[in-house]
């Protein structure tokens, strides 16, 4: 945990405050004459989950359990959680939501979490997609750090008006048939550029990520050896070729320009778009209803996002916490989370629910969104991410943006990114 030393130092104040808060709440309960039979669980979450409604439902049916939700920003919550478990006592919640990109880091500290296998995790494993379950499991299958919540199977959003302007099909089945490979995507991009002057995508990162996420091996093998030359270099070369030919734009993910471009109709497709992107586009481009649709992504779906519910060792109520999270992640509740907040279920039983499959979205030309994402979810491959995944991802993203924005040489940018990656890995 040496690499987390600075993080621990800078976040200790948070731990102290949370610990004091917990002590004050406990004292308040005693002075109010609260029952000793009441179990109080602190639950840390991030993002829009809809869990507050489900927690109320659970507490109504289980009056001996009180659940306190602490909702925060994603990075802050993960940093504070690691600080709390590193401190060894006080401050950590009974239940913590952990995002997929952070799971490997916390698995390195699995001695600070309860092994959910000991509480019956294997009895509920069949509820979930195999690849999702494996993401929170040790290599030998003996340790399960969390139960799966939502997932982010990827598709391809597209602007029907831009496709039509280019003289291309706009029916989602016809679009999927025309763009059924990355070679076909490239050829379609040339047509769109020629007919409209617009790129097929505004984001180099999304194009690269889409190809990367279809691979069974990406940045590291299971021995944590860097393998990018043999895996994602081809995706990088494909993306930079399209950048240099003016077929892919220059917008950086999550920057204001990326959001505003959704409303402008300045590009044709958004490859690698997961279920949660549905709401993101609506928020950034509310006046474009009916101009978007959703098709299959060329050559198979990947996954972008999703979380797990874990139980830190500092909890005094692991059995009660497990009982709650096994209920919350069950198919019935995952369906409710989808209906409330749009969290896409990781429980395939939901994919057979008639009401679920009938879900359409008027904004996306009445696309059967649940059906499309369910089909994508079942084609995702299991991928080992590695504890240093974000280091590689950040540096390759920087290289792509330098090529797109600065006109930098792709090979020089790749070599520089590899050098930066290796330098950082040596310090871990």
Segments from the language model and where they lie:
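Short, low-complexity disordered leader/linker segments with a strong preference
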Residues: 1-40, 60, 419-428
């Amino acid at each position: 945990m040496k690499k987390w030393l600075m993080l621990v130092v800078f976040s200790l104040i948070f731990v102290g405050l949370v610990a004091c808060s917990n002590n004050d709440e406990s004292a308040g309960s005693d002075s109010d004459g609260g029952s000793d039979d009441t179990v109080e669980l602190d639950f840390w979450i991030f993002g829009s989950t809809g869990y507050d409604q489900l927690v109320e439902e659970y507490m109504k049916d289980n009056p001996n359990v009180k659940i306190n939700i602490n909702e925060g920003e994603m990075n802050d919550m993960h940093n504070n959680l690691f600080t709390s478990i590193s401190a060894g006592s006080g401050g950590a919640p009974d239940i913590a939501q952990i995002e997929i990109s952070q799971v490997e880091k916390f698995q390195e500290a699995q001695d600070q979490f309860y092994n959910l296998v000991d509480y019956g995790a294997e009895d509920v494993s069949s509820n979930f997609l195999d690849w999702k379950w494996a993401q929170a499991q040790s290599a030998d299958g003996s340790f399960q750090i969390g139960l799966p919540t939502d997932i982010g199977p990827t598709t391809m959003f597209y602007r029907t008006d831009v496709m039509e302007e280019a003289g291309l099909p706009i029916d989602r089945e016809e679009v999927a048939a025309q763009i059924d490979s990355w070679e076909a995507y490239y050829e379609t991009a040339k047509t769109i550029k020629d007919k409209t002057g617009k790129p097929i995508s505004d984001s180099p990162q999304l194009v690269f990520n889409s190809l990367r996420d279809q691979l069974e091996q990406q940045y590291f093998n299971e021995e944590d050896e860097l393998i990018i030359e043999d895996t994602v270099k081809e995706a990088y070369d494909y993306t930079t070729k399209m950048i240099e030919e003016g077929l892919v734009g220059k917008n950086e993910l999550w920057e204001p320009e990326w959001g505003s471009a959704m409303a402008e109709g300045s590009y044709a497709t958004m490859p690698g778009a997961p279920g949660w992107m549905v709401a993101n586009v609506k928020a950034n481009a509310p006046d474009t209803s009916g101009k978007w649709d959703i098709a299959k992504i060329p050559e198979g779906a990947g996954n972008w996002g999703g979380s797990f519910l874990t139980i830190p060792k500092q909890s005094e109520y692991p059995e009660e916490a497990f009982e709650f999270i096994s209920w919350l992640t069950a198919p019935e509740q995952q369906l409710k989370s989808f209906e409330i907040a749009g969290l896409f279920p990781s429980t395939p039983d939901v994919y057979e629910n008639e009401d679920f499959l009938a879900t359409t979205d008027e904004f996306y030309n009445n696309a059967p969104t649940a059906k499309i994402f369910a089909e994508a979810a079942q084609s995702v491959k299991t991928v080992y991410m590695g504890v240093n995944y974000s280091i590689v991802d950040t540096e390759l993203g920087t290289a792509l943006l330098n090529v797109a924005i600065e006109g930098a040489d792709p090979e020089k940018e790749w070599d520089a990114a590899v050098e930066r990656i290796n330098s950082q890995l040596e310090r871990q």
